[in-house]
């Protein structure tokens, strides 16, 4: 299927981001996986392509407007749900080491498939609640 990515490209330009062809492909794959998995589990109420581009992908990247992302090396997405903003940030800023934390294992199964299908590295999923993860030595003061 041929997707019009104009909304995504224009939104990224506002944040000083220029997407390459691989990143565009990854966003399309992410969208397709999101819609496919959303049929069997509630990941998002927004499934229209243009709405996902704007309300999930572009909004996830809005942090880049106020931060110099080249100076950030690690981040955690607490309560990541369907992977927003963590996955879009990883696609656009591949140098980031990202942890996706969520209390529901079924959402992490979805995210692990997204990570694999998109060929992302330097990103991990962690099952648990924020207050519990903060007490574990492997997570405390690491991000």
Name every feature range the model reports, one short phrase each.
Residues 20-24, 50, 77, 103:
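Short linear sequence motifs
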Residues 14-16, 40-43, 49-50, 54, ...:
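Generic secondary-structure boundary/loop-capping signal
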Residues 4, 30, 52, 77-78:
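Residues at the start of alpha-helices and the adjacent loop-to-helix junctions
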Residues 61-143:
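Conserved SAM/SAH cofactor-binding pocket of Class I
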Residues 1-46:
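N-terminal auxiliary segments of SAM/dcSAM-dependent transferases
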Residues 2-4, 48, 132, 136:
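Alpha-helix initiation/capping motif
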Residues 23-26, 43-64:
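Conserved SAM-binding loop and adjacent beta-strand
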């Amino acid at each position: 299927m041929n997707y019009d990515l104009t909304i995504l490209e224009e939104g990224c330009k506002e944040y000083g981001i220029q997407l390459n062809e691989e990143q565009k492909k990854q966003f399309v794959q992410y969208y397709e996986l999101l819609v496919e998995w959303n049929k069997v589990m509630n990941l998002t109420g927004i499934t229209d392509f243009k709405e996902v581009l704007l309300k999930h992908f572009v909004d996830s990247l809005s942090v880049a407007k106020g931060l110099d992302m080249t100076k950030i090396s690690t981040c955690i997405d607490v309560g990541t749900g369907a992977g927003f903003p963590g996955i879009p940030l990883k696609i656009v800023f591949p140098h980031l080491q990202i942890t996706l934390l969520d209390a529901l294992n079924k959402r992490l199964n979805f995210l692990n498939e997204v990570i694999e299908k998109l060929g992302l590295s330097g990103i991990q999923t962690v099952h648990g609640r924020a207050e519990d993860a903060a007490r574990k030595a492997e997570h405390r003061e690491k991000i």
